[in-house]
């Protein structure tokens, strides 16, 4: 396994930039900033793209500018162009089943109702075997309130917790890319904010 493409899921536009559903994009944006890279819009990949070198390895970055439920269009375009296999892709996304201040890495799995993941799995030939960075945003407690919740902006204290987990995930990214997933998982999963 070699991570060659890191994707941060989001909805496009200023009105969504600070919403919980864009937590994946917050991670990719911080990653680019840490490594002094600028994300540039590339229409052929339907998103903002960048490139990092981690431990001598080239890693592409992507924040789709499609709506969340069409994220797979951007991911498939970039993966096809650079011949990147699903198992070499890391997709960062908001996760209702984790609390703010926590993040988890995993390989494969279902989409858990997340429309961005659902479309990516479909566009990668129904292949769910890509890595996920699940960024905790919590759950509103009622499934009927989920849409409003993910499209809402977290209060300041909650956003600080989400940002602290993203910050730790960025620190673990080089371990994931240059060493191994288990080491990165152990460090990230042990993280506690504060």
Curated annotation (Swiss-Prot):
Reported function: Hydrolyzes ribosome-free peptidyl-tRNAs (with 1 or more amino acids incorporated), which drop off the ribosome during protein synthesis, or as a result of ribosome stalling. Catalyzes the release of premature peptidyl moieties from peptidyl-tRNA molecules trapped in stalled 50S ribosomal subunits, and thus maintains levels of free tRNAs and 50S ribosomes.
Residues the entry annotates as binding tRNA: 16, 67, 69, 115
Protein name in the entry: Peptidyl-tRNA hydrolase
GO cellular component term of the entry, any: cytoplasm
GO molecular function per UniProt: peptidyl-tRNA hydrolase activity; tRNA binding
Classification via PANTHER family: PEPTIDYL-TRNA HYDROLASE
Top-level division of the source organism's lineage: Bacteria
Chief subcellular location: cytoplasm
Site feature (Stabilizes the basic form of H active site to accept a proton) residues: 94
Active site: 21
InterPro entries in the record: Pept_tRNA_hydro, Pept_tRNA_hydro_CS, Pept_tRNA_hydro_sf
CDD domains linked: PTH (cd00462)
Localization of this protein: Cytoplasm
Keywords carried by this UniProt record: Cytoplasm, Hydrolase, RNA-binding, tRNA-binding
Gene name linked to the record: pth
Family: Belongs to the PTH family.
Source organism (scientific name): Sodalis glossinidius (strain morsitans)
Site (Discriminates between blocked and unblocked aminoacyl-tRNA): 11
Enzyme class: hydrolase
Keyword field contains RNA-binding: yes
């Amino acid at each position: 396994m070699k991570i060659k493409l890191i994707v941060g899921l989001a909805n496009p536009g200023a009105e969504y930039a600070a919403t919980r559903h864009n937590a994946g994009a917050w991670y990719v944006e911080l990653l680019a900033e840490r490594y002094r890279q600028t994300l540039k819009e590339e229409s052929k990949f339907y998103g903002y793209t960048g490139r990092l070198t981690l431990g001598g390895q080239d890693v592409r970055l992507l924040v789709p500018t499609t709506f969340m439920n069409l994220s797979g269009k951007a991911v498939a375009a970039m993966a096809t162009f650079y011949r990147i296999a699903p198992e070499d892709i890391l997709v960062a996304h908001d996760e209702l089943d984790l609390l703010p201040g926590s993040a988890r890495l995993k390989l494969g799995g279902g989409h858990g109702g997340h429309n961005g993941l659902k479309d990516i799995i479909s566009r990668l030939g129904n292949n769910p075997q890509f890595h996920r960075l699940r960024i905790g945003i919590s759950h509103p407690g009622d499934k009927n309130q989920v849409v409003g919740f993910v499209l809402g902006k977290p209060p300041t204290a909650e956003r600080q917790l989400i940002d602290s987990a993203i910050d730790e995930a960025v620190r673990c990214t080089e371990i994931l890319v240059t060493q191994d997933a288990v080491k990165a998982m152990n460090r990230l999963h042990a993280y506690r904010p504060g």
